[in-house]
Amino acid sequence: MVPWLGPDDPFPSIERALGPATGAPGLLAASADLLPSRLIDAYLRGIFPWYSDGQPVLWWSPDPRMILVPAEFKVSPSLRKTLKRVLRAPEWEVRVDHDFAGVMRACAQAPRRGQRGTWITAEIIDAYTSLYRSGNAHSIETWHDGRRVGGLYGVSFGRMFFGESMYADVTDASKIALAALIAHLREQGLEMIDCQQNTSHLASLGGREIARKAFVAHVRSAVAEPPIPWQFDKRVLAALTSPAETAAPTGTER
């Protein structure tokens, strides 16, 4: 049975999360609240919320866990060509934390293959905006001709980045933002991005699964490190335009 957490109840051990033979593998607990303090505690333990309107807040710690190592990011020839074009053209920009709430709302509205509705509820937007105000959530945004056309957002503690969602209004806009994030994290020496769940899109970009135990051990170490800076622009993309960067076709985004 999934435990119900009251306002002052701690998270149970992640080993108590439901297993693969259940209908909800990785489900750890449920609660009525999504307070910033609870959200921070969750991320520091390798736990994340994922639920829909009308449901209680559901907390997850799946095993295995999908991650992306920045050094293993794959760049397709077509994306490499796009990045070169973005670097040359002044109408293309990469902005950081310029419109965090707007990126979240755009992610909530983006259609997802095989999904109805959105898990990015008004409550989720409020909670993550609070993390953004405290410097623990960030948006990486692709702009063209002064208009935001794609981006992503996630949570950051110490030397760990937890990816949440991305969207694109024009072709490759989300990939440009992700590539900029990857290039920046490479510069900073970050070793892992949490991707939460396995998708063909993430796998095509170099994502892979690791055991939950290994993931949580890395999180505990990484979040204890000093935070990295979050100021960069599209110039970081130059590091990904070498022909040595390779990749495969892409699929569904979260």
From Swiss-Prot:
Name of the protein:
Leucyl/phenylalanyl-tRNA--protein transferase
Provide the family line: Belongs to the L/F-transferase family.
The broad enzyme category this protein falls into is transferase
**Annotated function:** Functions in the N-end rule pathway of protein degradation where it conjugates Leu, Phe and, less efficiently, Met from aminoacyl-tRNAs to the N-termini of proteins containing an N-terminal arginine or lysine.
Q: Which GO terms describe its biological process?
A: protein catabolic process
Q: What is its main location?
A: cytoplasm
Q: Which reaction does it catalyse?
A: N-terminal L-lysyl-[protein] + L-leucyl-tRNA(Leu) = N-terminal L-leucyl-L-lysyl-[protein] + tRNA(Leu) + H(+); N-terminal L-arginyl-[protein] + L-leucyl-tRNA(Leu) = N-terminal L-leucyl-L-arginyl-[protein] + tRNA(Leu) + H(+); L-phenylalanyl-tRNA(Phe) + an N-terminal L-alpha-aminoacyl-[protein] = an N-terminal L-phenylalanyl-L-alpha-aminoacyl-[protein] + tRNA(Phe)
Q: Which GO terms describe its molecular function?
A: leucyl-tRNA--protein transferase activity
Q: Which UniProt keywords apply?
A: Acyltransferase, Cytoplasm, Transferase
Keyword hit for Endoplasmic reticulum: no
- Where in the cell? Cytoplasm
A GO cellular component term found in this entry reads: cytoplasm
Q: What is its EC number?
A: 2.3.2.6
